[in-house]
Amino acid sequence: MTEAAIAGAATKDATIREIADEAFTAFNSGGRHVLPFSTRYPAFSLNDAYHVTALVNNMRIAQGYKPLGRKIGFTNRRMWDEYGVRAPNWGYVYDRTMHDLAVPLPLAPFIEPKIEPEIMFGFVAAPSPGMDDAALLRCIAWVAHGFEVVQSIFPAEVFSGRHRRRQCNARRAAGRAAP
């Protein structure tokens, strides 16, 4: 690797860390908006966003959050063109971001909240590529109706598959799990 390539990689790593710090601070500020990262960093990619997500996950764990699993978004391919995405995406779900539907969930602390209905699955084993339907079903421990309260740190819900990782701080509420 050349000196220029090493310097470029170090600069990119520093930028990703800066973005993660800014996102983490915005999510914890109780309503602070930031300009979309991809408008300030034109080379910011979905892969970079997942690096930011990993750093924010580490920050959450340091705060005492316990990861419970992941939320998979954009599983409906008909929405991809409208939102400029080309594959499903995911975000972490934590013990402090999961709520029972029987308990009221105030919306005041959220930044521009949006509510999305969900079907939630609890997995006992991770699915593997190439599984048939029966094998995939054996990975599922429970199913529940639920909803996701999504918030965005970007003003007016600016969206692009490149810069939005709003799932980092969404809340999920689930009904009773059924085997």
Feature-to-residue mapping (PLM):
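Catalytic-core "active-site belt" of small-molecule-metabolizing enzymes
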Residues: 2-179
